């Protein structure tokens, strides 16, 4: 509630009313007397004369509008209207309308100095907006026009200020089910690969592709014509950044397109012949593109929706088979697409698009790996943590090494025997007594090849024993000379020959170091090299792999472990 100063000097004569007395003119809150009860009408065809117990509802006449001084300016009259509306919004008692018009206008009208200062401030604010505002020409006039409340009234609905009984528009009441906060519903369903790509484009803020047909707004139709057509309105419209365009033939300014939110930083003009060459050349390029054969254009065009759907189905099947996309390569997906659609997908553009699809699929929630995925083979159980060691440049663990060694041994069981990766560590620490029961069911001297993985601290190496030739060969991808390992294996073979009564194998063992093998160039691929040594020795294949083949060989090892079978 607004506080004023009670007194004769400010408010004029006191309003008439019984029992209305004010003490000394001090600053206090307004205390209005109770309004007198209106007299009821009777007679004139309105029914019987009401008595003491009869109440007839009547309509209260609106208070007369106050008269304004002839000397008041037009702006002061608008300010007085705004002040009266503000006072009406304060819900003052009805006796406020019974005061004299001159008293209310004198009480509400600000001083001459205050009016001048307000006008000066508004003029300076409008001038600053004109100089420094970055808004367009359309929005500037809207801001300047919106200073006056009477001009902001919607002209399309002139009866909005009337009540519904007087013929005005019915107020828009929100539905009881309407809520003004964003509802928290169920989480959105899992998007497919195509939906994820569209969502990523929306997150990047890529602008939508214009559709080109004519545009309609507020009943006016703006149809884009040829760029060189002077009647199209494009050369005579008002530019969105405030620059005026060329006028029409009759001096009238044409309408601007509905999308006036684009700011043009540089405006230049070109000759008609240059513009014609530009647009004609583009039209010729489009015609030449359309003249291409459908088969050739289809082979080199970007991926279509059915291609994206096929890629997603391939990735889904791959994820269920291998638990992750670690052993997947782009070439493999491209080959499957070529087999299905009988088209060329190995072009650089299409191949890069396939790679982007794979990366987008991996970023989707739940597609990194299948939780709970396991591979069981005999006594071996591989989890995703074990299989994850084959990704990138991770170090292989004992579980992967031992299961792959068993796969090698089971591929040629009569020829090869593979020792567990913990065998050498137990032999080195506890001697023959610690490992003498490891081969109680196997006569190793009936085999052709013995494979013994060696794990020293953080490095993998391999010892291969040719039983017939009685040779012990040490394979190391870092080409280190470790003489202790062959000696420990030679002592074990002698002790095993004595225990198994194979005295012909007690003597004649020789040790070698294999130096002309593929060498690793990092600190993480030693385990993958050892597995390839085992496979190629067991299958009697030459060492044709190098360091550059390790990413592909890691993916191949992953698949062989999941299928529990070597790729021969």
UniProtKB/Swiss-Prot annotation:
Q: Enumerate the UniProt keywords alphabetically.
A: Cytoplasm, Hydrolase, Nucleus, Phosphoprotein, Protease, Thiol protease, Ubl conjugation pathway
User: Which residues, renumbered to this chain, carry the PTM Phosphoserine?
Assistant: 52, 71, 73, 163, 175, 182, 206, 226
- Comp. bias (Acidic residues): 72-87
- Active site (record annotation): 459, 476, 526 (nucleophile)
- An example Pfam family from this entry, by short name, is Peptidase_C48
Entry annotated with the keyword DNA damage: no
Q: Record's InterPro entries? A: Papain-like_cys_pep_sf (IPR038765), Peptidase_C48_C (IPR003653), SENP3_5_cons_dom (IPR045577)
Map motif Nuclear localization signal onto the chain: 119-122, 147-153
Q: Where in the cell is it found?
A: Nucleus, Nucleolus; Nucleus, Nucleoplasm; Cytoplasm
GO cellular component terms listed in the entry, alphabetical order: cytoplasm; MLL1 complex; nuclear body; nucleolus
Write down the PROSITE patterns for this protein, in alphabetical order.
ULP_PROTEASE
Q: Which GO terms describe its biological process?
A: negative regulation of double-strand break repair via homologous recombination; protein desumoylation; proteolysis
UniProt main location, coarse: nucleus
Q: Which residues carry this modification: Phosphothreonine?
A: 170
Q: How is its activity regulated?
A: On oxidative stress, SENP3 degradation is blocked by inhibition of its ubiquitination, which stabilizes it as it accumulates in the nucleoplasm.
Keyword hit for Repressor: no
Which residues fall in a compositionally biased region of kind Basic residues?
106-119
EC category name: hydrolase
Q: Name one GO molecular function term.
A: cysteine-type deubiquitinase activity
> PANTHER family given for it?
SENTRIN-SPECIFIC PROTEASE 3, SENTRIN/SUMO-SPECIFIC PROTEASE
Similarity annotation:
Belongs to the peptidase C48 family.
Query: What subunit structure does UniProt give?
Result: Component of some MLL1/MLL complex, at least composed of the core components KMT2A/MLL1, ASH2L, HCFC1/HCF1, WDR5 and RBBP5, as well as the facultative components BACC1, CHD8, E2F6, HSP70, INO80C, KANSL1, LAS1L, MAX, MCRS1, MGA, MYST1/MOF, PELP1, PHF20, PRP31, RING2, RUVB1/TIP49A, RUVB2/TIP49B, SENP3, TAF1, TAF4, TAF6, TAF7, TAF9 and TEX10. Interacts with EP300, NPM1 and CDCA8. Component of the 5FMC complex, at least composed of PELP1, LAS1L, TEX10, WDR18 and SENP3; the complex interacts with methylated CHTOP and ZNF148. Interacts with NOL9. Interacts with CCAR2.
Under which name does UniProt file this protein? Answer: Sentrin-specific protease 3
Q: Which gene encodes it?
A: Senp3
């Amino acid at each position: 509630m607004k506080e004023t100063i009670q007194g004769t000097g400010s408010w004029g004569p006191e309003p008439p009313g019984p029992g209305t007395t004010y003490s000394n003119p001090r600053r206090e809150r307004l205390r209005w007397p109770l309004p007198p009860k209106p007299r009821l009408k009777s007679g004139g065809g309105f029914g019987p004369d009401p008595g003491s117990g009869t109440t007839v509802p009547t309509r209260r006449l609106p208070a007369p509008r106050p008269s304004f001084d002839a000397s008041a300016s037009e702006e002061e009259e608008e300010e007085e209207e705004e002040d009266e509306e503000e006072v009406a919004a304060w819900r003052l008692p009805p006796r406020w309308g019974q005061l004299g018009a001159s008293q209310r206008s004198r009480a509400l009208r600000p001083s001459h100095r205050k009016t001048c200062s307000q006008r000066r401030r508004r003029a300076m604010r409008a001038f600053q907006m004109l100089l420094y505002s970055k808004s367009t020409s359309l929005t500037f006039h809207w801001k300047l026009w919106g200073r006056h409340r009477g001009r902001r009234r919607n002209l399309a609905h002139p009866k909005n200020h009337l009540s519904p009984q007087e013929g005005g528009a019915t107020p828009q009441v929100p539905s009881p089910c309407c809520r003004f906060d964003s509802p928290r519903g169920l989480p959105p369903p899992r998007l497919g690969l195509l939906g994820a790509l569209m969502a990523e484009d929306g997150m990047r803020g890529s602008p939508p592709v214009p559709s080109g047909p004519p545009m309609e707004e507020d009943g006016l139709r703006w149809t884009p014509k040829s760029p060189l057509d002077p009647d199209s309105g494009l050369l005579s419209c008002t530019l969105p950044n405030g620059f005026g365009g060329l006028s029409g033939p009759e001096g009238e300014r044409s309408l601007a397109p509905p999308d006036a939110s684009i700011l043009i930083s540089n405006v230049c003009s070109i000759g008609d012949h240059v513009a014609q060459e530009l647009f004609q050349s583009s039209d010729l390029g489009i015609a030449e593109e359309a003249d291409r054969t459908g088969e050739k254009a289809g082979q080199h065009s970007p991926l279509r929706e059915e291609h994206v759907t096929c890629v997603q189905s391939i990735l889904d099947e791959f994820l269920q088979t291998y638990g992750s996309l670690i052993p997947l390569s782009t070439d493999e997906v491209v080959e499957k697409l070529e087999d299905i659609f009988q088209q060329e997908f190995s072009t650089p553009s299409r191949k890069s698009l396939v790679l982007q699809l794979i990366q987008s699929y991996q970023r989707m929630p739940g597609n990194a790996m299948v939780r709970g995925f396991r591979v069981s083979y005999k006594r071996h159980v591989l989890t995703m943590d074990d299989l994850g060691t084959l990704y990138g440049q991770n170090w292989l663990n004992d579980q992967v090494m031992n299961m792959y060694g068993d796969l090698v041994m089971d591929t040629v069981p009569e020829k090869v025997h593979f020792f567990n990766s913990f065998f050498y560590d137990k032999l080195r620490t506890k001697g023959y007594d610690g490992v003498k029961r490891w081969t109680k069911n196997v006569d190793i001297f009936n085999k052709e090849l013995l494979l013994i993985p060696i794990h020293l601290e953080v490095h993998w190496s391999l010892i291969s024993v040719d039983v017939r030739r009685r040779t012990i060969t040490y394979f190391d991808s870092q080409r280190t000379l470790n003489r202790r390992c062959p000696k420990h294996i030679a002592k074990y073979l002698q002790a095993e020959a004595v225990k198994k009564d194979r005295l012909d194998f007690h003597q004649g063992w020789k040790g070698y170091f294999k130096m002309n093998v593929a060498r690793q160039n990092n600190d993480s691929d030693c385990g993958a090299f050892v597995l390839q040594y085992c496979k190629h020795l067991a299958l009697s294949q030459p060492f044709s792999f190098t360091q550059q083949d390790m990413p592909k060989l890691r993916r191949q090892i992953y698949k062989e472990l999941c299928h529990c079978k070597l790729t021969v």
